[in-house]
Amino acid sequence: MRNNKTPFLSAIFTASIRGYQRFFSAFTPSSCRFYPTCSNYALWLLCFESPLSAMGKIAIRILSCNPFCSGGIAYPTTRLKRPSLIQSHKDSNRNFKTITFWLVPTKSHATYYIIKV
């Protein structure tokens, strides 16, 4: 279920994050305290959330990335009515779809962890 509500705004945010990854982050030492990295966390959220909702969650994640936080594994979460096959495409040689993300229910079963395959 790709975010189609505001594709232009999502595309701008996605392009800016990819630019950051390619031109700035690639030339600095790896120092992220979390998995997935904050920029990947942002890209994954932009696939599932509206851009404004995603920006709020991304801001909280970036603010928690400081020396006083222990870090660790922190997957983004989203609310969906039902899980679906996300960002699939047909392989040119075979007639099957490739799974890009797994949606794993949290303990509350109201939200899902977004895990990239």
From Swiss-Prot:
Keywords: Cell inner membrane, Cell membrane, Membrane
Purpose of the protein: Could be involved in insertion of integral membrane proteins into the membrane.
Main location: membrane
Keyword Manganese appears in the UniProt entry: no
Entry GO CC: plasma membrane
UniProt record similarity statement: Belongs to the UPF0161 family.
Topological type in the membrane: Peripheral membrane protein
Keyword Cell membrane: yes
Residue stretches in coiled coil: none
Subcellular location: Cell inner membrane
Protein's UniProt name: Putative membrane protein insertion efficiency factor
